[in-house]
Amino acid sequence: AQNCAFEVVSEILGDCCYAGGASANDAVQTSRLDRFTMLVSDLYPEALWHKYYTGIYRCNKFFEKIDGAAFEDEDLRAMYKAEGHFLRAYYYFDLVRLFGNVPLILTPLTPADFAQKQAEPAAVYEQIATDLLTAIGMKRADGSPAMTEAANQFDSADKGRATLDAAKALLCRVWLYYTGYY
């Protein structure tokens, strides 16, 4: 369910969810989605929330540890940091589009810190743009971009990595959503 949660939850913005079957109890979550009465405890939004905040936690933990890690190749460290900023921006972009006000967490939390206040979408979009601009602006030692420019420059083992082009495209999409043109 977690792999299709985004596609299902994003349908609340449209009118494409229909429960199918013989009774009113068939696909109850889908029926609630169609009637705009989705609960936060329903599988789809809960799975998305968990998936994205797990990714954000991992990015934040990564940022906390990366500078203390030993690297033989500093260009690799720069690439990983740029990819981390891209991923955190990606996770927050989906969260803010689907849920509006969400907690904006930029450091790893302990269980004592779990009760976080929700941030206004403007603050979340600002952080998304900051993360993407950071990813785009990170450089290797020779001054070239830290991220690989395009997906076709990867060998098969690295397909799916974040690229400079992906970061620029996501930034454009973020600005379109935030300014209301999309």
Give names to the regions the model predicted.
Residues A1-A19, R32-D34, E46, K61, ...:
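Acidic, glycine-rich segments characteristic of secretory precursors and extracytoplasmic regions
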Residues N101, D158-A167:
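Aromatic-lined, polymer-binding surfaces characteristic
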